[in-house]
A protein has these predicted regions:
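Short alpha-helical DNA-recognition segment
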Residues: 16-34
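A short, Lys/Arg-rich alpha-helix, primarily the initiator
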Residues: 1-16
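DNA major-groove recognition helix of helix-turn-helix
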Residues: 36, 66
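Residues within the helices of the helix-turn-helix
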Residues: 8, 19, 49
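Short, basic-rich loop-to-helix N-cap that marks the start of a DNA-contacting helix
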Residues: 39-50
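The alpha-helix within a helix-turn-helix
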Residues: 11, 22, 52
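Conserved small/polar residues in nucleotide/adenosyl-binding loops
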Residues: 72-74
Length: 74
C-alpha cells in the first residue's frame, strides 16, 4: 500500500517546468524533484495547496493511493 505522486503528469499537462514550478511554490528544485520522483516521505498541506494553486488542480490530481506498489513502475 502506498501513495504515489503524479506531479510529473500534472506538470506536463500544464506545460510547466520543474524550475518554474519550484520558483512559483517557493521550494528548492531539489525538494520538488524528491516529491516528483516519489522519494518524499511527507508533504505539508501548505506545500500541496501551493502546488494545486499554481497547477490549477485538486490534491487528488497529484496524489494517488495504490494498494500494491509492486504493480506500479515508479
Amino acid at each position: 500500500m502506498g501513495i504515489i505522486v503524479n506531479l510529473d503528469v500534472m506538470m506536463a499537462k500544464r506545460k510547466i517546468s520543474l524550475t518554474e514550478l519550484a520558483n512559483q511554490v517557493d521550494l528548492t528544485q531539489a525538494n520538488l524533484s524528491i516529491l516528483k520522483n516519489n522519494k518524499a516521505k511527507a508533504i505539508r498541506f501548505s506545500t500541496l495547496e501551493s502546488i494545486c494553486e499554481v497547477l490549477h488542480c485538486q490534491p487528488g490530481d497529484i496524489l494517488e493511493y495504490v494498494e500494491d506498489l509492486s504493480l506500479i513502475h515508479i
